[in-house]
């Protein structure tokens, strides 16, 4: 498949399609079903689903996506965290910069056996009540969690060990991620050097602004925390040469101008940057703060004037 993607890019003169996979966070699943070094040779990105570590299928409450473990947790439970799972993929042979960390914008809920016992590990009788819109026991979208938090007699707790919040009211309990926990996870990701984030899923964020902090507050918090973060793709794997001994495709050259000719081209990976070609010489430039590059006009412009960059309006 990798060769097919490369061949399609060469024949069409388009950018190569990305070959990615969503993979489990469970250390047991990794060991049982994945040849990690072989996967890493061919995949552009490896999306690690670092969530659903705990849920209504268990008899004790646990957080959906803890960054770190409780000090009191068993050796097995300490492996059910974002930190451990992401690093397990590295230990098994995945390059740091190819690993994309899953960020949930939903919560897992439980019905407590005893409302007076609500800490992590408390006994549960099953999933919590179904959400008004998602309609699934044991699961709430972030905008449904906001409704839960707004109701009287709800207690919100920040778990300093796991670096995530949970809340309870009566016999209902929900573990989830908020702006604080997701910013913390992104900061951790940057420190460790992972490739980036993937969100599950954008439609579960507060897309109407019901929670009171604007539309898509969780997504925006992560994007803001990631601003300016870059990683170098240090390892791309020993890709095979097409049958027949054909030479490996050369990197497409952006600047093909005649000597003395100047042209401007947008950076397809960053609206705020562009390339200046002087003959065959390439220069990477940045627009002033608040502006993006308008390739049609060859100038830095307001985001509202560039359709592909309109999502940056107001930032």
Located regions from the model:
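Substrate-binding surface in catalytic domains of secreted glycosidases
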Residues: 1-145
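Acidic-and-aromatic substrate-binding clefts and catalytic sites of carbohydrate-active enzymes
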Residues: 25-30, 176, 205-206
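Disulfide-rich extracellular ectodomains of metazoan secreted and cell-surface proteins
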Residues: 185, 193, 200-203, 246, ...
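Cysteine-rich, disulfide-bonded extracellular modules and peptides in secreted proteins
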Residues: 231, 243-315
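Solvent-exposed, polar/charged alpha-helical surfaces in well-ordered, non-transmembrane soluble domains
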Residues: 3, 37, 41, 83, ...
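Well-ordered beta-strand positions
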Residues: 44-45, 196, 273
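Conserved beta-strand elements of beta-rich interaction domains across eukaryotes
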Residues: 24-26, 53, 106, 181, ...
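Glycan-binding loop/region signatures in secreted carbohydrate-active enzymes
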Residues: 54-76, 103-188, 208, 213-245, ...
């Amino acid at each position: 498949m990798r060769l097919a993607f490369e061949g399609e890019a060469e024949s069409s003169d388009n950018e190569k399609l990305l070959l990615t996979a969503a993979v489990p966070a469970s250390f047991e699943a990794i060991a049982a079903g994945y040849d990690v070094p072989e996967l890493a040779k061919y995949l552009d990105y490896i999306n690690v689903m670092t969530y659903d570590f705990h849920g209504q299928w268990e008899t004790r409450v646990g957080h959906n996506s803890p960054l770190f473990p409780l000090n009191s947790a068993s050796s097995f439970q300490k492996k059910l965290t974002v930190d451990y799972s992401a690093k397990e993929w590295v230990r098994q042979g995945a390059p740091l910069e190819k690993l994309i960390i899953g960020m949930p914008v939903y919560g897992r809920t439980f019905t407590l056996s005893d409302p007076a016992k609500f800490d992590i590990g408390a006994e549960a009788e099953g999933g919590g009540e179904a959400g008004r819109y998602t309609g699934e026991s044991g699961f709430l979208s972030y905008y449904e969690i906001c409704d839960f938090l707004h109701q009287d007699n709800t207690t919100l707790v920040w778990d300093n060990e796991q670096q995530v919040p949970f809340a309870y009211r009566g016999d209902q309990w929900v573990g989830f991620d908020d702006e604080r926990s997701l910013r913390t996870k992104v900061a951790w990701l940057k420190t460790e050097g992972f490739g980036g984030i993937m969100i599950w899923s954008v439609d579960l964020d507060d897309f109407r602004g019901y929670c009171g902090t604007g539309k898509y507050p969780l997504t925006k918090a992560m994007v803001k925390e990631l601003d300016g973060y870059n990683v170098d793709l240090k390892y791309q794997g020993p890709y095979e040469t097409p049958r027949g001994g054909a030479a490996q495709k050369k990197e497409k050259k952006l600047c093909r101008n005649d000597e003395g000719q100047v042209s401007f081209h947008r950076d397809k990976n960053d609206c705020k940057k562009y390339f200046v070609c002087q003959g065959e010489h390439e220069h990477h430039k940045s627009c002033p703060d608040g502006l993006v590059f308008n390739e049609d006009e060859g100038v830095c412009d307001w985001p509202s004037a560039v359709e592909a960059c309109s999502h940056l309006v107001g930032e």
